[in-house]
Structure formats: structure tokens, C-alpha cells
């Protein structure tokens, strides 16, 4: 497997950071709580193996108390919920994503706030 060094390094950094104050974040314990083997986790963190499936990444993010989308993006994966939304209207959503590409974070927040208001009208 090709692996994903950036994902592995970020995952290790987050886990090690938490391990300083909580032994539950040792490689073995974290792997067990994430639903994968310690060997697999070790190889992921070293960039030797590809990241696990999205559901495992989401579980890891929950344990690490980070935004799952951050880890999913690093792993080049999409949240299964978002996948379902995209399948509902693929052409419109593809057009929307291409249109907003390159917009500033502030503009994107304005757009999502506007969309949220429209949805609740």
C-alpha cells in the first residue's frame, strides 16, 4: 500500500499530544478504541499504509476531539453522509463546489449562513 504520510503524521501528532496527559491515548489503547489493530495504526502513522475507512477515521476524530472533516480531508475521503447528499443532486452540487472554489473563508461562511436561513424559511 502506498500510504499517506501527511495523514499519518497528523494523526500521530494529535494522539501523542493527548497521550502526554492521558495514557488512554497510547498506541495500543487508541487503536483498540478506534476499532483497528495496533500494528495497523502504527503503519498508518508511519505512512506505510493508507488511512482506514471513513467510519474509523470519524471514530478517531471523535476520540481525539477534532473535526472529522479535517482528518477525512487529509485521508482523501468523504464523510458518508456527505456522499449521500452529493448523490441526491450531483450536477448542482458539483457546480456549486466549482463556483465557490477559491472563495475566502469569510465569504464561504456568509454563503453557508445565507443557505441556512433559506432552508429555515
What role is predicted for each listed range?
Residues 1-23:
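A short, Lys/Arg-rich alpha-helix, primarily the initiator
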Residues 12, 28, 58:
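Residues within the helices of the helix-turn-helix
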Residues 15, 45, 56, 75:
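DNA major-groove recognition helix of helix-turn-helix
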Residues 18, 48, 75-79:
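The DNA-recognition helices of helix-turn-helix-type DNA-binding domains
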Residues 20-44, 73:
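Short alpha-helical DNA-recognition segment
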Residues 35, 53-70:
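DNA major-groove recognition helix of helix-turn-helix/homeodomain DNA-binding modules
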Residues 38, 54, 71-84:
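Amphipathic alpha-helical "recognition" segments
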Residues 76-121:
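Interfacial/linker helices and their anchor residues that mediate assembly or domain coupling
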Amino acid at each position: 500500500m502506498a500510504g499517506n504520510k501527511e495523514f499519518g503524521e497528523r494523526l500521530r501528532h494529535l494522539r501523542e499530544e493527548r497521550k502526554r496527559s492521558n495514557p488512554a491515548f497510547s498506541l495500543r489503547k487508541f487503536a483498540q478504541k478506534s476499532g483497528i489493530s495496533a500494528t495497523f495504526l502504527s503503519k498508518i502513522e508511519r505512512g506505510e499504509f493508507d488511512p482506514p475507512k471513513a467510519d474509523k477515521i470519524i471514530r478517531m476524530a471523535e476520540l481525539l476531539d477534532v473535526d472529522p472533516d479535517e482528518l477525512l480531508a487529509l485521508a482523501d475521503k468523504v464523510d458518508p453522509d456527505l456522499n449521500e447528499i452529493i448523490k441526491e443532486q450531483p450536477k448542482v452540487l458539483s457546480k456549486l463546489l466549482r463556483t465557490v472554489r477559491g472563495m475566502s473563508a469569510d465569504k464561504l461562511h456568509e454563503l453557508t449562513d445565507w443557505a441556512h436561513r433559506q432552508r429555515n424559511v
